[in-house]
């Protein structure tokens, strides 16, 4: 399973990229708004850091297919690695079909059911993004959805990749890997959590103590 980082914060992206563990970035209107910067400026800066798929979403106020297609084409022009992120709606599927036929990569987002994922894949989506944590929030096991989508895509040999989104903790990441997600897009804080374990910390401190006992500081 591959790791993307889910943020529009350039400093977080630089730190994660320096670890050598991420191979793509996902953003959304909320993450861009949080940075308080121009969309194109932020996205261009990100493409200069990470050499991999960069998801940039159409505006939250864009609701009709024609507008999504127009905006998607502009997003795709920013860089060859751009992926146009489109909401899972009837109009979104129409836009996905057209953009995919034009060779533009698409990421259908806000997926909460296997049927939605299957429709997006049939429309030509490069990626689908089921939201794990948000399903958990309403007492519906999000990991079951990831597993079901993975099974369906495997049965029908669909090329669309699953990006597990709304990942909240390291357990989610392990579960997604076991459930067959191709990618987990993860906040920087969760990536850092994954590097830690109390026994690792204890082992490092023991090595330090043993070294100092023999060689001093």
UniProtKB/Swiss-Prot annotation:
Mind listing the UniProt keywords for this protein, alphabetically? Cytoplasm, Pentose shunt, Schiff base, Transferase
Q: Does the keyword Isomerase apply?
A: no
User: What is the recorded function of this protein according to its Swiss-Prot or TrEMBL entry?
Assistant: Transaldolase is important for the balance of metabolites in the pentose-phosphate pathway.
Q: Could you identify this protein by its name?
A: Probable transaldolase
What are the BP-aspect GO terms? carbohydrate metabolic process; pentose-phosphate shunt
> Per its UniProt record, what Pfam families does this chain match?
TAL_FSA
Does the keyword Transferase feature in the UniProt annotation?
A: yes
Organism encoding this protein:
Lachnoclostridium phytofermentans (strain ATCC 700394 / DSM 18823 / ISDg)
Q: What is catalyzed by this enzyme? A: D-sedoheptulose 7-phosphate + D-glyceraldehyde 3-phosphate = D-erythrose 4-phosphate + beta-D-fructose 6-phosphate
Annotated catalytic residues: 85 (schiff-base intermediate with substrate)
> Per the UniProt record, which EC number(s) apply here?
2.2.1.2
Q: Name one GO cellular component term.
A: cytoplasm
Major location category of this protein: cytoplasm
SUPFAM superfamilies, A to Z: Aldolase (SSF51569)
Please name the pathway. Carbohydrate degradation; pentose phosphate pathway; D-glyceraldehyde 3-phosphate and beta-D-fructose 6-phosphate from D-ribose 5-phosphate and D-xylulose 5-phosphate (non-oxidative stage): step 2/3
| Protein localization | Cytoplasm
Coiled coil (UniProt feature) = none
């Amino acid at each position: 399973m591959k790791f993307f980082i889910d943020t529009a914060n350039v400093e977080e992206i630089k730190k994660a990229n320096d670890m050598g563990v991420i191979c793509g970035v996902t953003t959304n209107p909320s993450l861009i708004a949080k940075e308080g910067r121009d969309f194109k400026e932020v996205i261009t800066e990100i493409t200069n850091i990470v050499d991999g798929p960069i998801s940039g979403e159409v505006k939250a106020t864009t609701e009709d297919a024609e507008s999504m297609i127009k905006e998607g084409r502009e997003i795709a022009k920013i860089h060859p690695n751009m992926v146009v992120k489109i909401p899972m709606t009837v109009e979104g599927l129409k836009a996905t079909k057209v953009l995919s036929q034009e060779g533009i990569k698409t990421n259908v987002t806000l997926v909460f059911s296997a049927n939605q994922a299957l429709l997006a894949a049939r429309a030509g989506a490069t990626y689908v993004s089921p939201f794990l944590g948000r399903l958990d929030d309403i007492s519906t096991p999000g990991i079951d959805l990831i597993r079901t989508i993975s099974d369906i895509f495997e049965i029908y040999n669909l090329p669309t990749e699953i990006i597990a989104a709304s990942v909240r903790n390291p357990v989610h990441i392990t579960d997604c890997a076991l459930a067959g997600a191709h990618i987990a897009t993860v906040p920087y804080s969760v990536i850092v959590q994954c590097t830690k374990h109390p026994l690792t910390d204890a082992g490092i401190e023991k090595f330090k103590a043993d070294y100092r006992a023999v060689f001093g500081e």
